[in-house]
Design a protein with these regions (language model features):
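NAD(P)-dinucleotide binding in Rossmann-like oxidoreductases
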Residues: 5, 205-206, 226-273
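Beta-strand-loop-alpha-helix segment that lines the small-molecule cofactor/substrate pocket
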Residues: 68-75, 79-126, 141
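N-terminal Rossmann-like dinucleotide-binding module
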Residues: 1-48
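Conserved SAM-binding strand-loop segment of SAM-dependent methyltransferases
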Residues: 50-57
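Glycine-centered tight turns that cap/initiate beta-strands
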Residues: 27, 49, 65, 142-145
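Predominantly a Rossmann-like dinucleotide-binding segment in NAD(P)-dependent oxidoreductases
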Residues: 125-234
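Short, conserved SAM-binding/catalytic segment
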Residues: 43-50, 107, 111-112
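Short active-site oxyanion
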Residues: 28-32, 67-69, 176
Length: 273
């Protein structure tokens, strides 16, 4: 059986994570990477040992030898890039969110199914051993009827108004930030564990830092940066720092959870009860 040939589009924080994951599979070759320009693509390729690089992602899509692509770009680019990949006949694994609107997601779903291509998101938290154990226990009936669920997902990497990342900009990220970035993981997890779908919810979202200091240069995800006054611009923020949600699942189950990217001391604190 021949190995699948795959490529990465996007060289930010998740690029190295996906490169490592692909290499651990054993039956997939990571053959190319695309970034915003030739230099950054080449630098990333050299750092992780990928043989080919390009500053134009369409070069990868036009390569008939590549079976699948991982799209790891800012959220607003997911829709055009996934669509282009599907039209080029590539199977797609895309970072969440798939798109920033439901209409775009439905269009891509229909396109992928019409072309009989694999298209998916990866919710990596599903694969922790404890998560798989809880799911097996629920499926075996060991947990009884699940009537109440609750939990949190808290981080602190955007605690200060000097913390910056492209996700703060709704033009790149979409309207939902904390809720879309980490709340989506919590909602996927609770549905995965309980076997029930969320049927209704109401949410209170809050932006605590109405303005932030945007650096003149780029800042990689989860990295801090000390700025001098002449190195930043004060910009308005319209994405959420925090969210509290009440939800209904199935016929009887009820629950609540909170998400935050401004909880001091919480690096990646996830809980489900």
């Amino acid at each position: 059986m021949r190995k699948l040939r795959t490529a990465i589009i996007g060289t930010g924080f998740m690029g190295k994570v996906h490169a490592e994951g692909i290499r651990r599979l054993g039956n997939v070759d990571l053959v190319a990477v695309a970034s915003i320009d030739d230099q950054s693509a080449k630098q990333f390729a050299d750092s992780v040992g990928i043989p080919a690089s390009t500053g134009d992602y369409r070069t990868i899509l036009n390569d008939p030898s590549i079976d699948a692509v991982h799209i790891l770009t800012p959220n607003a680019l997911h829709y055009p890039m996934v669509k282009a990949a599907l039209l080029a006949g590539k199977n797609v694994l895309c970072e969440k969110p798939f798109t920033v609107t439901a209409a775009e997601a439905k269009e891509l779903l229909d396109l992928a199914e019409s072309k009989k291509l694999v298209h998916c998101l990866e919710h990596n938290l599903r694969y922790y051993p404890v998560v798989q154990q809880i799911r097996r226990m629920r499926e075996a009936g060991d947990l009884g009827d699940i009537l109440i669920v609750q939990g949190t997902y808290s981080q602190d990497w955007l605690l200060y108004d000097t913390d910056w990342n492209w996700r703060l900009d709704s033009k790149e990220n979409g309207a939902l930030r904390a809720m879309g970035d980490i709340g989506s993981h919590w909602m996927d997890m609770i549905q995965h564990l309980t076997g029930q779908k969320i049927t209704a919810l109401c949410a209170d979202l809050q932006t605590f830092h109405k303005t932030r200091k945007k650096p003149a240069g780029s800042v990689e995800t989860f990295t801090g940066k000390t700025l001098q006054p002449d190195q930043y611009t004060e910009v308005s923020i319209d994405t959420d720092d925090f969210g509290a949600v009440l939800l209904r699942m199935g016929d009887r189950t009820r629950g609540c959870f909170t998400v935050s990217q401004m909880s001091a001391g919480c690096k990646n604190r996830f809980s489900v009860e």
